[in-house]
Amino acid sequence: MVKNSTSIRTRKRVKKQILDGIAHIHASFNNTIVTITDRQGNALGWATSGGSGFRGSRKSTPFAAQVAAERCAEIVKDYGIKNLEVMVKGPGPGRESTIRALNAAGFRITNITDVTPIPHNGCRPPKKRRV
């Protein structure tokens, strides 16, 4: 006997209007991750240099970070964000170009904070490369 299956309706997520957001930029030596959240820290959208089509050593370029920031801005523009607070973490090459790309995407940057973790003589750093 075959049961009649009822169609399951999935509700479309309602995009709420958010005026202020926080852009978290994690710029490592190998990649750049851009995440835009609301004030409470709920992620609205994210993009990476690697996910933007750059592989290998091209992931760690300022241009790849710029493209990732543009993609992230495109994802979250439906939320109506006008102002962004920027939190930059890490020593990577995409720090400055990401902020410039977010500014060019139409966001008003209100605050830039460096939240790079600095050890108080914690773990031993990796040894120097010999090429």
From Swiss-Prot:
Pfam families linked: Ribosomal_S11 (PF00411)
Alphabetical list of SUPFAM superfamilies matching this protein: Translational machinery components
Keyword DNA repair: no
NCBIfam families: PRK05309.1, uS11_bact
Family: Belongs to the universal ribosomal protein uS11 family.
Subunit structure: Part of the 30S ribosomal subunit. Interacts with proteins S7 and S18. Binds to IF-3.
The protein's name in its UniProt record: Small ribosomal subunit protein uS11
Natural source organism: Buchnera aphidicola subsp. Acyrthosiphon pisum (strain APS)
Lineage: Bacteria, Pseudomonadati, Pseudomonadota, Gammaproteobacteria, Enterobacterales
